[in-house]
Amino acid sequence: MSTKKMAEHETTPKNGMDPHAIAEAVRNGMFKDDNASRAMGMQIEEVGPGYARISMIVRSDMLNGFRICHGGFITTLADSAFAFGCNSYNEMTVASGIVVDFLAPAYEGDRLVAECHEVSRAGRTGVYDIKVTNQHGKAVVVMRGRSHTLKGKPVVNL
C-alpha cells in the first residue's frame, strides 16, 4: 500500500500506539481464534490501518460440481480480508452487508489474494472494497462491504 494511500487512512490512536502496531496486534489476536480462515489455509500477508491482504490456495475440497472453486469459498476469503481490514483500529467491527460480483472462475491450485481497502470510515459506519485476484493478477471477485463498529468494544487488550 502506498504511503499516500496509507496516510489517508491513518488516525492517531487514543493510546498513542503506532497504527501499524495496533493493526498487527489485532491481526494476531483475531487470527489465533479464527478457525474458519485457518481451516481454509488462509495466510495473512499484510495488515495496516483500514487495509488487509490475505491469500489462500484453492484445494480440491473447495471445488463445486463444475470443478471450479465454489463461490462461497472465494467470498469467505474476501470476507476475511474485510474483517481484518475493518477491525484494524482495534474497535470490534462487524459486517452489516456485502455485495459480491463474480468475474472469473478459480481452479484447483490457484493462489487467490484478497486485498481490502478502506473507502470510508465515519462514526460507526465503514465502507470497504475487496478485490480477489489469482496468481496471474486476473480479477476473480470484487466485493463491497459495509461495516458497523460496536461502541466501546476493543478486539484485543493493548
Where are each of the predicted segments found?
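Terminal targeting signals and extreme-terminal segments of soluble enzymes
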Residues: M1-L158
